[in-house]
Amino acid sequence: MSEKHPGPLVVEGKLTDAERMKHESNYLRGTIAEDLNDGLTGGFKGDNFLLIRFHGMYQQDDRDIRAERAEQKLEPRHAMLLRCRLPGGVITTKQWQAIDKFAGENTIYGSIRLTNRQTFQFHGILKKNVKPVHQMLHSVGLDALATANDMNRNVLCTSNPYESQLHAEAYEWAKKISEHLLPRTRAYAEIWLDQEKVATTDEEPILGQTYLPRKFKTTVVIPPQNDIDLHANDMNFVAIAENGKLVGFNLLVGGGLSIEHGNKKTYARTASEFGYLPLEHTLAVAEAVVTTQRDWGNRTDRKNAKTKYTLERVGVETFKAEVERRAGIKFEPIRPYEFTGRGDRIGWVKGIDDNWHLTLFIENGRILDYPARPLKTGLLEIAKIHKGDFRITANQNLIIAGVPESEKAKIEKIAKESGLMNAVTPQRENSMACVSFPTCPLAMAEAERFLPSFIDNIDNLMAKHGVSDEHIVMRVTGCPNGCGRAMLAEVGLVGKAPGRYNLHLGGNRIGTRIPRMYKENITEPEILASLDELIGRWAKEREAGEGFGDFTVRAGIIRPVLDPARDLWD
């Protein structure tokens, strides 16, 4: 992309305060243990407010009641979000029963939130329940280590229920990569699990004493599905199979979607192809990419610290050569692969192992007992009788995996009675939002609470123009950090202010093109008016099989983003 102007390998200058905090934290301990015993505040103070993120938690408050509490001279109602580490999204039914119980008894909101990074979150954990949640997870073989902040986050893996053998192999690699890149500090075990301090000094051979410059995201993807949205991630291993068996990976590095409104130095970027590697080099290459970013990433500006910016600064070829040097390998040429879609196949799918897999559409990933739709109770009942496992997808849905023919009817009956199999439109199945209000401190506009009624309106437009059986990949994210992955959608809404969004168009169905801003800071009626006209044109003028995003580019409605580091903001 930008080989012409390679910049310095290391950015000199004053380090950010986050770097000071990590350096002084004694390998992520800080004074979290002491802070836990401070009953005067419901939150964590000073550096601990940020340090708990390395332990998988974010401190939040209920923004719906923030002003009211301020008037009463009360501190915000602090509560933690906890995100579990769950490589590939696979969770046993025993683990599910434990998290269901904790959510119901020990969180403010009582829900389990499936995320588009293939794990679950608890929202609304009061300080007194913070230690118990880590102990509960540990008791069933789970943890929340390194699911937030400057680490390698939860490793994603394509949810492919059909090719069971290939999925099993890819999933094992997702787990191995996750384990290999975990921090080695004993802080987590000491603080949450009461394990004794050992005299040995901590060492972080891969992550280093100050960890990574910024968050780092990794995927294992099995074509032709791009359900995990590889271009949103720093490091991607694309599975290459021969005769149904995994033989190696294509490596793509440097994707990422987060931007800042109006800051043209920030941009979303698709990942760059580095080459093919045989399986035996996987962990060495993963480590080499991470340590190169550790050493070369910008620690003087967190808005310029992600791998995508490092690649653009030093040049893709320079970064790739350093990865080869550190891993002691030479990449082979990229092997052919293609993507055909990224949605989940809702309903029953029979695997080549003759087991059945039931993918349930969970709107916004929010599992709760709703009036007439007791989703949470239904899943608990299934977990009690199901012999296989559950798999969370990167589309915030849930797969009941490995159901023998003899158990199918029993599980389907519970699912139907609980509202887990209610029919929804293809459009709703292909729409997604991040959490946003009321819990996310960064939210600028509604997302999860906005999406259901917004999609009602879109469904009406699709029906009006005779395309109800079609879909447009549509996503809403409450702020430009982009958790809702709107910057890889055909239609992406990025929150700007309460009730206002930037409308992006021109991504594609398979998630390989960044959409461009079409209109700025507009309201829902204005968004719907624009889409009414454009969906009408698409319905009439499209070519056979042409998706909405591709149509908007071909028809000249929007210019495609070809080189986002240079042309995203044009």
UniProtKB/Swiss-Prot annotation:
Names of the cofactor(s): siroheme; [4Fe-4S] cluster
Keyword Cell cycle among record annotations: no
Biological processes annotated in GO: cysteine biosynthetic process; hydrogen sulfide biosynthetic process; sulfate assimilation
Record InterPro entries: CysI (IPR011786), NiRdtase/SiRdtase_haem-b_fer (IPR005117), Nit/Sulf_reduc_fer-like_dom_sf (IPR036136), NO2/SO3_Rdtase_4Fe4S_dom (IPR006067), NO2/SO3_Rdtase_4Fe4S_prot (IPR045169), NO2/SO3_Rdtase_4Fe4S_sf (IPR045854), NO2/SO3_Rdtase_FeS/sirohaem_BS (IPR006066)
Pathway linked to the protein: Sulfur metabolism; hydrogen sulfide biosynthesis; hydrogen sulfide from sulfite (NADPH route): step 1/1
Class in the EC hierarchy, top level: oxidoreductase
This enzyme's EC code(s): 1.8.1.2
Binding site for siroheme: C483
Keywords: 4Fe-4S, Amino-acid biosynthesis, Cysteine biosynthesis, Heme, Iron, Iron-sulfur, Metal-binding, NADP, Oxidoreductase
Family classification: Belongs to the nitrite and sulfite reductase 4Fe-4S domain family.
Record's subunit section: Alpha(8)-beta(8). The alpha component is a flavoprotein, the beta component is a hemoprotein.
This protein's name: Sulfite reductase [NADPH] hemoprotein beta-component
